[in-house]
C-alpha cells in the first residue's frame, strides 16, 4: 500500500474513488453523490491538482485506489481534513491512519499547526478512530450540508510543539 498526493493525471482515479465513497457512505459527507457526479471531467482534473488550498490523497494497493482523504483550506483560514474514506475490505489495515498522517503532514508543511474535521458522534467507529489519531471534540456543531437532519461536531488536532 502506498499513499500520495494526487496530480492532474490522477483525476479519473480521484473521481472514481470519491464517487464510490459517496455511494458507500452517503451520510458521512457534506457532498452528495448526485452533486459530485455532475462535475465535468475538467472539474475533476482541476481538483486533482494539489495546491496549498486543497490537496487530495489517494491510497493505493498496487495501482488500485483503495482510499481517499483531503486537506482543504477554508475561507476562514481553518485547515480541514475532509473526504476521508477507505474501501470496506481495507478497513482496519492502517490505510486510514496513513491517510490521516498524510493530511496532517500536508497541513504542517503548509504552515498550519491545527487541523479540524466534522464527524457525527453517532458514527462511533469514525469518532473513536479520530480520537486515536489525536483529535478532540470541540463544542461546535452544525448540520451536515448533504443531510441537514444530521448534526456533526467539530474535532481538532494540534501539532505538538
Please give the residue ranges for each predicted region.
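Long alpha-helical, hydrophobic tracts
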Residues: 1-4, 8
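Acetyl-CoA-dependent GNAT
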Residues: 8-9, 15-89, 100-102, 106, ...
